[in-house]
Amino acid sequence: VYMSGSRVNCNVPNDALADYDIVYVVKDTKPFYEDSHYMERFGEILYMQEPDRLDASVGKKLDFNEKYTWLVIYTDGNRIDLTVCNEKKADITGDRVYRVLLDKDGRFANAPVSDDRARWVKKPSEAEYAAVCNEFWWCINNVVKGIKRYEITYAQDMMNYYVRPMLLKMLSWKVGILTDFSVSVGKSGKYMNKWLLDDDYEMLLETYSGGLAGEMYHALKVMADLFDKIGLFVGDKLGYEYNERDSKAARIYMDMVRKMKL
């Protein structure tokens, strides 16, 4: 039995909302997935999800005899993500952040030392840096067209699923530079405020807009300003050239489309 995730990672905040990610390595998973009442021993269940069963119900091919997972929230507020799996699927080295709770058969005697290095921000190559810059500025055209046409759901998707990830990537590289690439910023950059300047973080928060066209234009402009600022910083520190031509061109197009009569 081992636990992984934030509960065993000393480098991330830990509070009452942190999940318990528990894995039981067993010889036979069938008794567990056929009758899960044993989970009630951990407390009264408020509600739960069985992602493997849901995936199988829509045609995804899964072998419950290899691995099965439950996501459970109890009435006391605790959440347990519990997996039973055979030894073949016990991926203790893949996560690298874990704590062995019980090892009756000595299966984890030679397990590597637990750490979160695999999640640290990685220094980008010059090609990766250039690609992120180009993707950010290019994808802005889809956002501004969506706003202009009042296709708000489309524009929001373009902003949040294509443009924003590039901004967060660039911000994570700044954090990497400030920390000698020795930390993780967490999923969706949720820990970045620990290292970013207050002004930078406040600008980032300003990029999360509502559904009004004016709000979205403003958020997009702030995104562009912040990306320029951080992109120049990262490029300077790593010795990479920042593509100011794309930045200027994208801004020209943004203004052109906003003033356009359809």
Each model region followed by its residue ranges:
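Metal-dependent nucleotidyltransferase catalytic core
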Residues: S4-L17, V23-L82
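Glycine-rich loops and low-complexity Gly/Arg-rich segments
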Residues: V25-T29, L46-P51, R96-Y98, D105-A109, ...
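Short aromatic-enriched loop/helix-cap "lid" or pocket-rim segments at secondary-structure transitions
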Residues: P13-A16, G94-D95, V185
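Short, solvent-exposed loop/turn segments at secondary-structure junctions
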Residues: V8-N9, T29, E87-K89, I177
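A short, charged helix-loop
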Residues: Y98-A127
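A contiguous, low-structure linker/loop signature
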Residues: G77-R107
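Conserved nucleotidyltransferase catalytic core and NTase-mimicking acidic/glycine-rich helix/loop elements
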Residues: W120-L262
